[in-house]
Swiss-Prot record:
Residues 84-152 are annotated as: Disordered. It comes from Maricaulis maris (strain MCS10). Belongs to the bacterial ribosomal protein bS16 family. Residues 97-123 have a biased composition (Basic and acidic residues). This is Small ribosomal subunit protein bS16. GO terms for biological process: translation.
Length: 152
């Protein structure tokens, strides 16, 4: 029999209240449990009354092989760090964007590339007439210099 220390929801709609219970992992979330070892009221401000745990019972159940869920393990670690070593779970897929977000990012990147290409073309077009005019002005100066050499 696999034991879990987990939350069992109670309270009214939009007003949650949780019992921290030891239960068989196969039993329903709010169903039958073996023992109630604490409570969690998320409606209270963050203070000592928000999470109440009987740490002696918690340690006894952990010694018997019960494993806390992530949330309850975090509560246990916050109250008494020696009782349970809580580590943040690593889920790299959670941070990965969804299909629509990937498509939107690809469209945005494509539009950005088109916009940059258009800017480059505009700069090149603006520089080309200036480049054509500049050699035309230099050419008469070069001709004038050549004429001066001939006249000498």
């Amino acid at each position: 029999m696999s034991l879990k220390i987990r939350l069992a929801r109670g309270g009214a709609k939009k007003r949650p209240y949780y019992r921290i219970v030891v239960a068989d992992s196969r039993s329903p979330r709010d169903g039958r449990f073996i023992e109630k070892i604490g409570s969690y009221n998320p409606m209270l401000p963050k203070d000592g009354q928000r999470v109440e745990l009987d740490m002696e019972k918690v340690k006894a159940w952990i010694a018997k092989g019960a494993k806390p869920t992530d949330r309850v393990g975090r509560f246990i670690h916050q109250i008494e760090a020696d009782a349970w070593k809580w580590e943040a779970s690593n889920n790299p897929q959670k941070a990965e964007p969804g299909q629509k977000a990937k498509e939107l990012a690809a469209e945005k990147a494509e539009k950005e590339a088109d916009r940059k290409a258009a800017e480059e073309e505009a700069k090149a077009a603006a520089a080309a007439p200036a480049a054509e005019e500049a050699p035309a002005e230099e050419a008469p100066a070069a001709e004038a210099a050549a004429e001066e050499e001939k006249s000498e």
